[in-house]
Amino acid sequence: MIIVISILVYLLSSAISANSRESEIIKNVTQGYEFNIFNWERENFFDKWISYINPFDNHKKIKSSEQLIQYLSLVEKINLNENLYSKLFTEKLDLDYKIKKGKIDVNIAKIKTNEINAEIEQLVEKINKDKVIKNEKKIYAEQFLEENISSAIQSEQVNIFDNIFYVPVDLSLEKTPKLLVISPRDKIYRQEDKLLNSNISLEAINNMELTLLEENNLSAIVVPTGGVSTYPSIVSEGDLLYILQTAAHEWLHNYLALFPLGRSYFTSTDMQSINETICDIFGNEVGIIAYEKIMDRKIDNEINQTKKINKEFNFDKFMKETRLVVEKLLSEGKILESESFMDEQRVVLSSNGYDIRKINQAYFAFYGTYGGNPESSNNYYDNLIQIKKRYKNLGDMIHDIKYSDNIEKIYSLLE
């Protein structure tokens, strides 16, 4: 429990420090949309622990992969119905607009509106009913996932702990906060970022980004987050492998917060990238181990290929080349040309099945933090993989690298 409290103290002190460093520009533009980590921890920190010690909860627990898949299928069903609700609601607003502007026959519009209202009413009833079931099972799905991730972390392939030191895996499946990232326009640099509420509207996002561009000459983007290393970690709902890998990634952030590597996160963009990249490597490996244990089969490489994409199109190569061109244009002072080029590339991506809302300097600044991403321009992923090859397992590597608080110490492990 002392270890858990230590992590929580570090997270909250980091949040206080981040608030003190925050520029007035960011404070003004995000007012009313901020994600409050203090309130979130107060509401969520003790929930899981209470459930674990409740002797009357045992019959409710999820104890098999079949039960877990049923839960995840229910979550997917709710998400699909919520998307359909949004579509119907938009159609209804469009009809109201056409009626006001006299662009549609009133009687025809009323018939269509009544049909939409009936569909919405049925849909809301289904969503609310399913959410009741989901909320009853959520904590038990989380416990099942936590137990399997914990087992993977302690497996021979990872083996990160001794018999004394242990950080419990704790996660909460929910909509994750969004993140506002800003960069100068004349270079790609993660200058500042801030967590925002998950329910911020697209209109508010667009206004925020536009204000920072037009009034402050900053490149800005609001991006979704897969997870946030609060305690418990916030993990977005998705397919099983995605959840496991994201949860393991966020868990390692919590673990590293107890050591120099994690505490160096905010000292430089280099150490930020090192932390994110090593958590990606760890999360991907641990997630696969946990997945194969839960499903009792080897992973299918096509498991996450659900999007309708052009398989002939090489996304990684395209994005790497895009970043190189952008950096060249920026180095020549051609800011407007670089921004036009990025938007043109976004259109090309969309035509090949990759729908990205916006690509700008801030986009590359954020996604480039993760060394394994094609948007990155550093070699940290390759370097960390080379370091990993020198160790018997992932845990031994983490044990040594967690004491590195600067890039020079990381590079010394390559010598």
Region spans (language model):
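Phenylalanine-focused residue identity feature
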Residues: 35-40, 45-46, 56, 89, ...
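Acidic/His-rich structured neighborhood in mature extracellular/periplasmic domains
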Residues: 93, 97-303
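Solvent-exposed, acidic/flexible segments
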Residues: 74, 78-81, 236-245, 272-276, ...
